[in-house]
C-alpha cells in the first residue's frame, strides 16, 4: 500500500482522523525540545511492543523533563533505580524493560554523550544507514537491533520527532498475524508494509465505528 493511500492520509493528515482517532504518539509533537521528543519516542518505542494507546503516550509526554527520560542522567542510575522510578511513575511494562532502557541510555551516553540527535547525524540522518548501524550495535542498543522496532522508531522520529530522515519511505515491517485480515480489507496483499501503514491499520481496527462521512477522514471505508 502506498503512503499516499486514503487510509494513510486519513490517519496521518486528516483533521478527523479515523473515526476521530489519530496517531496516538502525536501528543509528543507538543514537546518543544527536539532532544526531549527523541527521548520520549525512544522510550515509547521500547515500551510499544503492542502499540501504546493515546492515553499512555500522553502520560509519557507529560514526563518529558523527568530524569528518567534524560540519558545523561539515567545512564548513571542503576537498573533497580530505573525499575523503581518506572513503577513509581506507573509506567506499565515487563520488568526487563527497565534494564533495557538503562542499557540504551548507557549506550547513547557512551557513544554520543546522551544525544539521539547526534546519533542520527552520525548516520547521515538516513533511515537505512541507521537501521544498519543499530543491527550492528545489538549489545549497545538492545531491542533496536530488531528490524521491526527500529523501523517503527525511525518512522516516529521522521513524522513526530522533528528530524527529517532520508529513505524514510523505504522502511518496512512484517505485518503481524493479527493485522493480516485487516490488511486484506484494504487490498493489501504484501507481507511487508511501511510502519506507518501498520500503525494506521492498528488504529483503524480499534477505532472504526461506522460513523458517517462527516465524522471520519477515510473515504470508502471498508467498515461501512
Language model region names:
Residues 1-224:
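HhH-family (HhH-GPD) DNA N-glycosylase catalytic core used in base-excision repair
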Amino acid at each position: 500500500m502506498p503512503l499516499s493511500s486514503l487510509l494513510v492520509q486519513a490517519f496521518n493528515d486528516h483533521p478527523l482522523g479515523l473515526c476521530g482517532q489519530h496517531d496516538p504518539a502525536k501528543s509528543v509533537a507538543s514537546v518543544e525540545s527536539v532532544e526531549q521528543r527523541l527521548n520520549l519516542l525512544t522510550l515509547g518505542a521500547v515500551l510499544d511492543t503492542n502499540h501504546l494507546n493515546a492515553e499512555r503516550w500522553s502520560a509519557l509526554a507529560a514526563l518529558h523533563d523527568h530524569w528518567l527520560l534524560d540519558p545523561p542522567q539515567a545512564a548513571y542510575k542503576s537498573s533497580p533505580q530505573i525499575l523503581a522510578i518506572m513503577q513509581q511513575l506507573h509506567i506499565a511494562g515487563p520488568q526487563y524493560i527497565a534494564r533495557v532502557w538503562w542499557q540504551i541510555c548507557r549506550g547513547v551516553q557512551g557513544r554520543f554523550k546522551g544525544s539521539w540527535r547526534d546519533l542520527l547525524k552520525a548516520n547521515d540522518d538516513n533511515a537505512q544507514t541507521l537501521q544498519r548501524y543499530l543491527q550492528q550495535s545489538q549489545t549497545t542498543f538492545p531491542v533496536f537491533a530488531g528490524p521491526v522496532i527500529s523501523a517503527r522508531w525511525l518512522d516516529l522520529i521522521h513524522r513526530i520527532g522533528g528530524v527529517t530522515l532520508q529513505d524514510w519511505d523505504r522502511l518496512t515491517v512484517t505485518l503481524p498475524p493479527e493485522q493480516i485480515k485487516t490488511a486484506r480489507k484494504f487490498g493489501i496483499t504484501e507481507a511487508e508494509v511501511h510502519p506507518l501503514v501498520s500503525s494506521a491499520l492498528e488504529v483503524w481496527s480499534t477505532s472504526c465505528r461506522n460513523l458517517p462521512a462527516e465524522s471520519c477522514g477515510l473515504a470508502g471505508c471498508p467498515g461501512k
